[in-house]
Amino acid sequence: MKTFVLGGGCFWCLDAVYQKTRGVSSVVSGYTGGHVRNPDYYEVCSGTTGHAEVVAVTFDETVVPEEVILDMFFALHDPTTLNRQGYDVGTQYRSSMFYTTTEEKVLFEEAIERAQALWSDPIVTEVSRLPEFHEAEEVHQNYYAKFPYQGYCQVIINPKLAKARKYYSAWLTA
C-alpha cells in the first residue's frame, strides 16, 4: 500500500473521485503545509494558517498504478492557476503534492512533466516534503457521499466525477 498526499482545491472534490477509484482503500481529507498546530476548517479557510486542503489517498499499486492516481489528480483540477480552483480562492486551495520519500518526489515531478503536455500554461503545482498531516473534521470525510445534493456537490463535484468517468472509467468502481 502507498499513500499520496495531494491538494487540488477543495478536498471534497478529490475525495469524491478517489473514493470511487479501484484499489483505493482510504481517502482522508486534511490539512498540511502550514504553521498552525491542529488547525480547524475555519482557520484554514481564513487563509492565515498556510495550510492547504489535501487528501491522503492510500491505494494498492498492484491494482491501480501510481501514475493513474497522479494523472487523475492533474485531470481533476487546474494545476496552472496559483492559489485558486474555480470559485475557491486562497492559498488553502493551491495545487500541491507532498512527498515523504525521494522516490515520491521523483514520481511527482515526472507526473508534472506528463501533465504539462496537456496544459498550455505552466503548471504551478507545489511539490514539498510532507510536514505534519492534520485530519480534517469528520463532516469533511467522504463529504460527497454524505451530501450529494448539496449545491457545491451538484455544481462543482458532479462535473469532476463526470470527467473522471469519461477518462478513467476503467479505474472507477461506479
Swiss-Prot record:
InterPro entries reported in the protein's UniProt record: Met_Sox_Rdtase_MsrA_dom (IPR002569), Met_Sox_Rdtase_MsrA_sf (IPR036509)
Catalytic residues (positions): C10
Q: Which reaction does it catalyse?
A: L-methionyl-[protein] + [thioredoxin]-disulfide + H2O = L-methionyl-(S)-S-oxide-[protein] + [thioredoxin]-dithiol; [thioredoxin]-disulfide + L-methionine + H2O = L-methionine (S)-S-oxide + [thioredoxin]-dithiol
Q: Which Pfam families match?
A: PMSR
Q: Give the GO molecular function terms.
A: L-methionine:thioredoxin-disulfide S-oxidoreductase activity; peptide-methionine (S)-S-oxide reductase activity
The entry's family comment says:
Belongs to the MsrA Met sulfoxide reductase family.
Stated role: Has an important function as a repair enzyme for proteins that have been inactivated by oxidation. Catalyzes the reversible oxidation-reduction of methionine sulfoxide in proteins to methionine.
Protein known as = Peptide methionine sulfoxide reductase MsrA
Source organism phylogeny: Bacteria, Bacillati, Actinomycetota, Actinomycetes, Micrococcales
Gene designation per UniProt: msrA
